[in-house]
């Protein structure tokens, strides 16, 4: 297949639309089901690069959940705790611990379930049956992987009345060294961002505390590779083999740090005993439960515990999660990693990161206020590496 005609471009009025190879060669993909759209393919090709690089960097199966050309999370295949399984709605999945790919999917899809509603999924490895069973029951636009087990493919083909978008990519495909795009009829050309992110990038530790364990280095690598494919400005919190908060597309660095931090806090609080034991009505679907949990934790527009409201969601009226309970639970967090796609211009980013349990940081350095940022890290006993690598993505 040398080109694929799309229903439309970014918006329904943008026609005609298609994808094709500039040199007239075959596309490196097969479409096994559905008819992916313009934004679907933007998500697919960005997300595939992310998981491919994670697998190469860490040697573990990797999965990411994408929405509007940015990841909601990315994760590698590490088994989940019982509480995390419950928080991710996968505690009923048989054989989960036996499939590293399924563990990576459970983590990535379960991190920011509100934002992953209608996501695009990328997998570094051949999709197995366990992973397909989990993906089948989530609201998703499509998936890209280097292959699919026959039974897994048949499971996925039943989604969306047989119209679920399933793309298979050639894992050996390597794009040209130069990439191009047009804006307002003007062609932009640049070299692809081929810089390899690995442990060596974290060798310049500028803080007094220089103890960077392997687990922290892994999480920093996950954060940085995630940022490489996130719309800038961006900041990413990561822990235990997964990104837990992505702050994407903000014009201010501190707003990135706050947004990602609030997402990380929500992820932690989903594992609070009160949240895990909310008495949901049996007829309440998974997306509705996600909305209610978010409201319960963050006290959004609707008080889900109030008289006249709780009856819509719960069998019995739950006690609210108080500010004191949230503060106490969040105070137990530790060893969180944080990556930034550009330098921190002020130490307020460090102050906010500390509130979400951050101990390890990787950022390029180069600010005129680097000394103030380093001093703030030292006050909290943090470990910070200057990686010297800006990771803007547009």
What label would you give each PLM region?
Residues 53, 229, 266-270, 355, ...:
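Conserved helix-loop functional segments at active or binding sites
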Residues 70, 127, 239-240, 344, ...:
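Active-site-proximal loop/turn and secondary-structure-junction residues that shape catalytic pockets
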Residues 72-114, 244-343:
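Glycine- and Gly-Pro-enriched alpha-helical subdomains that act as flexible
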Residues 126, 205-215, 344:
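Bateman/CBS regulatory modules and CBS-like beta-alpha motifs in cytosolic regions of diverse proteins
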Residues 1-201, 216-234:
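Active-site loops and adjacent core secondary-structure elements that bind or stabilize anionic groups
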Residues 119, 123-124, 137-167, 172-174, ...:
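C-terminal binding/interaction regions
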Residues 57-65, 166-169, 232-239, 269-280, ...:
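Flexible, glycine/charged-enriched surface loops at secondary-structure junctions
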Residues 23-35, 111-117, 191-210, 287-309, ...:
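Gly-rich Lys/Arg/Thr-decorated short loops/hinges at beta-loop-alpha junctions or inter-strand turns
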